[in-house]
Curated annotation (Swiss-Prot):
Pfam families (alphabetical): EMP24_GP25L (PF01105)
UniProt subunit comment: Predominantly dimeric and to a lesser extent monomeric in the ER. Monomer and dimer in ERGIC and cis-Golgi network. Forms homooligomer (via GOLD domain); the assembly is promoted by direct binding with leaderless cargos and may form a protein channel that facilitates cargo entry into the ERGIC. Forms heterooligomeric complexes with other members of the p24 family such as TMED2, TMED7 and TMED9.
Region (Interaction with ARF1 and IL1B) location: 207-219
Cysteine pairings via disulfide bonds: none
Name recorded for this polypeptide: Transmembrane emp24 domain-containing protein 10
Domain free text: The GOLD domain is required for proper p24 heterooligomeric complex formation and efficient transport of GPI-anchored proteins.
Gene: Tmed10
Organism of provenance: Mus musculus (Mouse)
Keyword Chaperone (UniProt): no
Short sequence motif named COPII vesicle coat-binding, residue ranges: 211-212
PTM sites of type Dimethylated arginine: R171, R176
Length: 219
């Protein structure tokens, strides 16, 4: 049997670099489903790097048949409380935004209704970074071949991994600087405490000596 580029051979072990890319590739995808009881609120949090495209799709299955005026609100915010996406009476839809800084983002679903209403089923699919890009659309616009599209995807993925390592290195340096600063402060505080104890002990010696002299217990 032959393939596009010649005879097909038995697949060998993947190079470690490619295997590393394949293992890290799905890490930017969040797919989850859960049940949301009436008059409850559930939130999901995720840390995302700066300047990344975030896309998502959600679907909320209403099993109440419209009873009890059941409404579900969706809101996405950053750590500062800025609203990036909001939808009242959400049932099904998509959202997209670009992060401005490395931050913790929160996706919240809140259900409101009255009476005994079955739990809603919430399905959420979030992607960011390489996985959020529509490479089919890129291929159409730039007229790329399938192999070129895959190479573009691997290039973006490797760049994303390099950026992750650079960020982790930066965080490590910041934590090391913080640790060194803390150690220096602890050292200074220890020296200050030692001088305070020495001063207090000296004062006690002179005070007791004066007291004993006043009582004529010592000369």
């Amino acid at each position: 049997m032959s393939g596009l580029f010649g005879p097909l051979s038995r697949p060998g072990p993947l190079p470690s670099a490619w295997l590393f890319l394949l293992l890290l590739g799905p890490s930017s995808v969040l797919g989850i489903s859960f049940h949301l009881p009436v008059n409850s609120r559930k939130c999901l949090r995720e840390e995302i790097h700066k300047d990344l495209l975030v896309t998502g799709a959600y679907e909320i299955t209403d099993q109440s048949g419209g009873a009890g005026g059941l409404r579900t609100h969706l809101k996405i915010t950053d750590s500062a409380g800025h609203i990036l996406y909001a939808k009242e009476d959400a049932t099904k839809g998509k959202f997209a935004f670009t992060t401005e800084d490395y931050d913790m983002f929160e996706v919240c679903f809140e259900s409101k209704g009255t009476g005994r209403i079955p739990d809603q089923l919430v399905i959420l699919d979030m992607k960011h970074g390489v996985e959020a890009k529509n490479y089919e659309e890129i291929a159409k616009v730039e007229k790329l071949k399938p192999l070129e599209v895959e190479l573009r995807r691997l290039e973006d993925l490797s760049e994303s991994i390099v950026n992750d390592f650079a960020y982790m290195k930066k965080r490590e340096e910041e934590m090391r600087d913080t640790n060194e600063s803390t150690n220096t402060r602890v050292l200074y505080f220890s020296i200050f405490s030692m001088f305070c104890l020495i001063g207090l002990a000296t004062w006690q010696v002179f005070y007791l000596r004066r007291f004993f002299k006043a009582k004529k217990l010592i000369e």
